[in-house]
C-alpha cells in the first residue's frame, strides 16, 4: 500500500512538472514566434516609413499651393 502511494505521488508530481514545463516552453515559443519576425520587420518598416514620408512631402498640399502660387505670380494678371 505504501508503495502504491509513493508511485501515485511520483506520477502526479511528474505529471504536474511535465504539464508546467510544457506550458512554460509553449509560452516561450509563442513569444519567440512573435519577437523574431518583428526584428526582421523593423528594418523594412523603417525604409517603408522613410519612403512614405518622402511621398507625403512630395504630395504635401501646402507644398503644392506654394508651387502653384509661384507659378501664378509669373502670370501678369495675378
UniProtKB/Swiss-Prot annotation:
Belongs to the non-disulfide-bridged peptide (NDBP) superfamily. Medium-length antimicrobial peptide (group 3) family. GO terms for cellular component: extracellular region; membrane; other organism cell membrane. Expressed by the venom gland. Antimicrobial peptide with potent activity against bacteria. Acts by fastly disrupting the bacterial membrane. Shows activity against Gram-positive bacteria S.aureus (MIC=1.5-2.9 uM) and S.epidermidis (MIC=2.9 uM), M.luteus (MIC=23.4 uM), B.thuringiensis (MIC=2.9 uM), B.subtilis (MIC=2.9 uM) and Gram-negative bacteria E.coli (MIC=5.9-11.7 uM) and P.aeruginosa (MIC=5.9 uM), as well as against penicillin (MIC=2.9 uM) and methicillin (MIC=1.5-2.9 uM) resistant bacteria. Antibiotic activity is not affected by major negatively charged components of the prokaryotic cell wall (e.g. GO terms for biological process: defense response to bacterium. Keywords: Amidation, Antibiotic, Antimicrobial, Cleavage on pair of basic residues, Membrane, Secreted, Signal, Target cell membrane, Target membrane. Amphipathic and cationic peptide with an alpha-helical structure. The keyword Secreted applies. Has great tolerance to the acidic, neutral and alkaline environments. This is Antimicrobial peptide marcin-18. It comes from Olivierus martensii (Manchurian scorpion). Residues 42-78 form a propeptide. It is found in: Secreted; Target cell membrane. Its main location: secreted. Residues 1-23 form the signal peptide. The modification Arginine amide is found at residue 41. The keyword Signal applies.
Amino acid at each position: 500500500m505504501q508503495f502504491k502511494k509513493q508511485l501515485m505521488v511520483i506520477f502526479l508530481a511528474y505529471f504536474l512538472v511535465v504539464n508546467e514545463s510544457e506550458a512554460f516552453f509553449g509560452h516561450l515559443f509563442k513569444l519567440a514566434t512573435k519577437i523574431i519576425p518583428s526584428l526582421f520587420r523593423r528594418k523594412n518598416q523603417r525604409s517603408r516609413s522613410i519612403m512614405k514620408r518622402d511621398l507625403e512631402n512630395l504630395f504635401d498640399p501646402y507644398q503644392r499651393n506654394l508651387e502653384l502660387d509661384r507659378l501664378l505670380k509669373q502670370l501678369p494678371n495675378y
